[in-house]
Design a protein with these regions (language model features):
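Short, flexible turn/loop "capping" segments at secondary-structure junctions
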Residues: 1-2, 55-57
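An amphipathic, aromatic/His-enriched active-site/gating alpha helix that lines ligand/cofactor pockets
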Residues: 14, 25, 31-36, 56-60, ...
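Core segments of cupin and vicinal oxygen chelate
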Residues: 19-21
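Active-site-flanking beta-strand signature of metal-NTP-handling nucleotidyl enzymes
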Residues: 2-10, 62
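Glycine-rich beta-strand-turn "strand-cap" elements at beta-sheet edges
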Residues: 41-55, 87-115
């Protein structure tokens, strides 16, 4: 499996209407692009650990999209719903980091040893 990880920070002045439009486009993309296998979203939670100070600049939100393979991710990236989401994303966010990862299978330790 391939994970597409997006860390992002919304504009501090984003309007409620713009935020709703962004979320609607996000929902449309994840429900209409057939290669998306799983999606998780999160909001940063601070617990006072020392490592938190090392993560600057911090990102408030993340989105994690899962695909069967690289071809599935590439199909997602090229899909019209993702292209539309991407254009809207840049008008709603001030910064982002995006990474793609190969996920370990059921025997994660064995997979990690092979890396």
């Amino acid at each position: 499996m391939i994970a597409h990880l997006v860390l992002y920070e919304l504009r501090p002045d984003i309007s409620g209407a713009d935020r709703a439009h962004f979320l609607a486009a996000l929902e449309h993309a994840i429900t209409t692009i057939p290669t998306v296998r799983g999606v998780r979203f999160g909001r940063r939670h601070m617990i006072g650990a020392r490592y938190e100070a090392l993560a600057e600049p911090a990102f408030t939100f993340f989105a994690l999209f899962e695909f069967d393979d690289v071809a599935g991710l590439q199909a997602y990236l090229a899909h019209a719903s993702h292209v539309a989401l991407g254009q809207l994303f840049w008008s709603c966010c001030v910064r982002t980091l995006v990474f793609d990862y190969e996920l370990a299978g059921p025997d994660a330790i064995a997979t990690m040893k092979s890396w």
